[in-house]
Amino acid sequence: MRTATKTRVTAETSIELSINLDSAAESTIATGIGFLDHMLTLFAKHSRINLNVKADGDTRVDAHHTVEDVGITLGICLKEALGDKASINRYGSTYVPMDESLGFCALDLSGRSYLVFDAELTNPKLGDFDTELVEEFFQAVAFNTGMNLHLRVLYGKNTHHKIESLFKAFGRALREAITINPEIKGVNSTKGVL
């Protein structure tokens, strides 16, 4: 079974995170940051990954450390759960509309970390949440998974809708990439390793 559990404790945060790539059981997410909880719930639903997160962070300062550390821990768990990546599709991409907004995600579980984030988030805050942290979250996930991740908002007006379309697109593209394909023998690379 493709699962991973990680506890990550720093002077700024304490994160407990577990994933099961092959279970769509209901997720439990409690980061102390309402907007992040909402986005992670959407991600879990659309990726069909069971995701459980408990985070305590120095949110009295701001949400930055918690958002980034949840992303780091999610990336570490994804990398561990994927193991040698035998027989996975490796690539995934999708467009997701959210009302007037259209988000796009393409990713490659190549073992090479890179993030392209092209999203104009015109509203700097949604409630208490700094929208610039969305890019920080995806950077942390991509670099700790070893994932080449491209995210783009093609158009839209509402910042919440733009971000939501990206999290849903990320989930759906990741589901495509991690799906085991019986036609792929070994890893999906001419190098023989990912």
Swiss-Prot record:
An annotated GO cellular component: cytoplasm
Keywords tagged on the record: Amino-acid biosynthesis, Cytoplasm, Histidine biosynthesis, Lyase
UniProt catalytic activity: D-erythro-1-(imidazol-4-yl)glycerol 3-phosphate = 3-(imidazol-4-yl)-2-oxopropyl phosphate + H2O
Subcellular localization: Cytoplasm
Record EC number: 4.2.1.19
GO biological processes: L-histidine biosynthetic process
Cited InterPro entries: IGPD_sf, ImidazoleglycerolP_deHydtase, ImidazoleglycerP_deHydtase_CS, Ribosomal_Su5_D2-typ_SF
A GO term for molecular function: imidazoleglycerol-phosphate dehydratase activity
Annotated pathway: Amino-acid biosynthesis; L-histidine biosynthesis; L-histidine from 5-phospho-alpha-D-ribose 1-diphosphate: step 6/9
Pfam families noted in UniProt: IGPD
Major location (coarse): cytoplasm
Entries under NCBIfam families matching the protein: PRK00951.1-2, PRK00951.2-1, PRK00951.2-4
Family to which the UniProt record says this protein belongs: Belongs to the imidazoleglycerol-phosphate dehydratase family.
Protein name per its UniProtKB record: Imidazoleglycerol-phosphate dehydratase
Record organism: Listeria welshimeri serovar 6b (strain ATCC 35897 / DSM 20650 / CCUG 15529 / CIP 8149 / NCTC 11857 / SLCC 5334 / V8)
Organism lineage string: Bacteria, Bacillati, Bacillota, Bacilli, Bacillales
